[in-house]
């Protein structure tokens, strides 16, 4: 009799995705981040569900309901900090995953890559709206500043902002709708993840060499199930270290002050994972220009496949491109640092230089390096 996992309509899908899936024999730890993102999403949905049981999305009670969760609910503090720091782990894995895609040329799987970009936008939107929910000072002012950016859109801007706010400022209506969206989006993300995997399994995984590996495949189980499990344990260990020893390390102390529309915090800044984009936004002294640069800082990922000039897929054997890639990483770290600094000399100039460099590397220097490397191949 044939094994049930190969015949049952539902188990067959699981089998072809997680058990008998042919996988390249040489994929490194950089290929662990996809499954880690799945784990992060699961952690966020579960902790978020339990938080939603005790949270109230009303301006009068939102802040105190979060306090109530931390003080009075059994292990509420643990659930809350797992959720808050889980978001940080989510973004660490996301950026590593995208970086891996750029380094090893995984963006040549166009459908998978484009769904991935949509996923990135969806996760960023979810994280932003989640940050508003505790209704602290940084929640309120962060929401005010970021939603206000839409007013830079010509003609419809102001109307659009008031429509999103549900009034003439960030208030009750805004908080309630942000909670609704924050609750529904992770499930939409989960559906998009399924599509992401569907497209990936059409082509199979890429590998570090960038060379087709059809002649050398191994079954996903047990080789990569055990490898993913090791990744899971590492991620959970790191998350628990963060949650149990320094839960507020990555947060802003201003968010422990209840939201007050009459008192602006001296430095309005988003969570650390948005600082690089925030720095790019602030580098341009024009509102609409800044907003366009902000959107393009992520949307530029969609252009990367079009700029692939190399005869090789991966950067594994391309030292010039490798050097540029790591300069790009350093540049993003610089932007992250600048995003958290006040708008004054010398930070303004550093931010502007780093922003120009960010776009230059991706749009100009990397394609040029690829062409140079193609020439070197002929020597």
From Swiss-Prot:
Q: How does it sit in the membrane?
A: Multi-pass membrane protein
Q: Tell me the residue numbers annotated for binding heme b b566.
A: 97, 196
Q: Which Pfam families match?
A: Cytochrom_B_C, Cytochrome_B
Chief location: mitochondrion
Per UniProt, where does a ubiquinone bind? 201
Q: What biological-process terms (Gene Ontology) are attached?
A: mitochondrial electron transport, ubiquinol to cytochrome c
Q: Does the keyword Kinase apply?
A: no
Would the keyword Methyltransferase be found if you checked this record's keyword annotation? no
| Chain residues that bind heme b b562 | 83, 182
Alphabetically ordered keywords of this record: Electron transport, Heme, Iron, Membrane, Metal-binding, Mitochondrion, Mitochondrion inner membrane, Respiratory chain, Transmembrane, Transmembrane helix, Transport, Ubiquinone
What are its GO cellular component terms? mitochondrial inner membrane; respiratory chain complex III
Which cofactors, by name? heme b
In its UniProt record, a GO molecular function of this protein is: ubiquinol-cytochrome-c reductase activity
Role summary? Component of the ubiquinol-cytochrome c reductase complex (complex III or cytochrome b-c1 complex) that is part of the mitochondrial respiratory chain. The b-c1 complex mediates electron transfer from ubiquinol to cytochrome c. Contributes to the generation of a proton gradient across the mitochondrial membrane that is then used for ATP synthesis.
Protein name in UniProt: Cytochrome b
- Organism ancestry: Eukaryota, Metazoa, Chordata, Craniata, Vertebrata
């Amino acid at each position: 009799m044939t094994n049930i996992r190969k015949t049952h309509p539902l188990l067959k899908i699981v089998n072809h995705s997680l058990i008998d899936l042919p996988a390249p024999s040489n994929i490194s730890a950089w290929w662990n981040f996809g499954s880690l993102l799945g784990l992060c999403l699961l952690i966020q949905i579960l902790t978020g569900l339990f938080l939603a049981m005790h949270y109230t999305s009303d301006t009068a009670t939102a802040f105190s309901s979060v306090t109530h969760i931390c003080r009075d609910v059994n292990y509420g503090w643990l659930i809350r900090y797992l959720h808050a720091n889980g978001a940080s782990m989510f973004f660490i894995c996301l950026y590593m995953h995208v970086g891996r895609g750029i380094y090893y040329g995984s963006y040549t799987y166009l459908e998978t890559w484009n769904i991935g970009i949509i996923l990135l936008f969806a996760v960023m939107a979810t994280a932003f709206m989640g940050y508003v929910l505790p209704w602290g000072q940084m929640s309120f002012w962060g929401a005010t500043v970021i939603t206000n950016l839409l007013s830079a859109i010509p003609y419809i801007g102001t109307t659009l902002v008031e429509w999103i706010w549900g009034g003439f400022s960030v208030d009750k209506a805004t908080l309630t709708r942000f909670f609704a969206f924050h609750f529904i989006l992770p499930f939409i993300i989960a559906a998009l993840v399924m599509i992401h995997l569907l497209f990936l399994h059409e082509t199979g995984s890429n590998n570090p060499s960038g060379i087709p590996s059809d002649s050398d495949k191994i079954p996903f189980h047990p080789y990569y199930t055990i490898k993913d499990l090791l990744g899971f344990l590492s991620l959970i260990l790191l998350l628990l270290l963060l949650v149990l020893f320094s839960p507020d390390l990555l947060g802003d102390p201003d968010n422990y002050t209840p939201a007050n529309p009459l008192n602006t915090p001296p430095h309005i800044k988003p969570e650390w994972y948005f600082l690089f984009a925030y720095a790019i936004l602030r580098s341009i002294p024009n509102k609409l220009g800044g907003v366009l640069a902000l959107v393009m800082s992520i949307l530029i990922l969609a252009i990367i496949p079009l700029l692939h000039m190399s005869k090789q897929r991966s950067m594994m054997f391309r030292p010039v491109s490798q050097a540029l890639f790591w300069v790009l990483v350093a540049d993003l770290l610089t932007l992250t640092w600048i995003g958290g600094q006040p708008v004054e000399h010398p930070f303004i100039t550093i931010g502007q230089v780093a922003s120009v460099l960010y776009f230059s590397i991706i749009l100009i220097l990397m394609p040029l390096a690829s062409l140079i490397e193609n020439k070197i191949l002929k020597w």
